[in-house]
């Protein structure tokens, strides 16, 4: 049975996967993990130089990857990027809405511009990109959509009202869309990482980092591979009966 599950997770030959925020961190790890499954990759990011490096890494593994410059805060960029991917590959089977940012501040001092930017990239961007690609998934009657949420969207966090709102909103979007498209063979799920070792968390104050670690029952930070493997599972045939769910990857930091 285990061999059958592993085979189903590793068999994405002929499928096209689009990953946003693929130039570094969790997005890069997702790209490399999906490459192992045999999927051809459309890798999107605003940072073309770093994205080219990831494309090279995928190709060195024997995989197929094409880079697309995409600014998920800009509707025109999203629409033109989606068209470019479809023109290149003809379809998108797997969509991973991974791109995201933080702009932390306490509520009383948070700038409206920081609220707007976080919502634009973390929530509106996934909405627009999913909308741009959904029709062809419905036509093909198969699709996997995986949205990158966060433990912060599940439990909240002081100083991150914008980020928490964006990720909680993404979870709500995930569940609602899952109900809309289930009859078309499309699953929609979210992965909610906890304290993961990434460039985004590397800048945290040592005291903040230590306090977060103390709240993790498994007593370690997660890795981008931990998250990438969860995404690859949800994108696979092994997860064909899972939709509208949030897969928490947080070492027990949040249980709910």
How would you describe each model-predicted region?
Residues 182, 187, 242-244, 250:
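Short, small/polar-rich loop/turn modules that mediate ligand/substrate recognition or access, typified
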Residues 106-107, 111-119, 212:
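Substrate-binding pocket helix/loop in short-chain dehydrogenase/reductase
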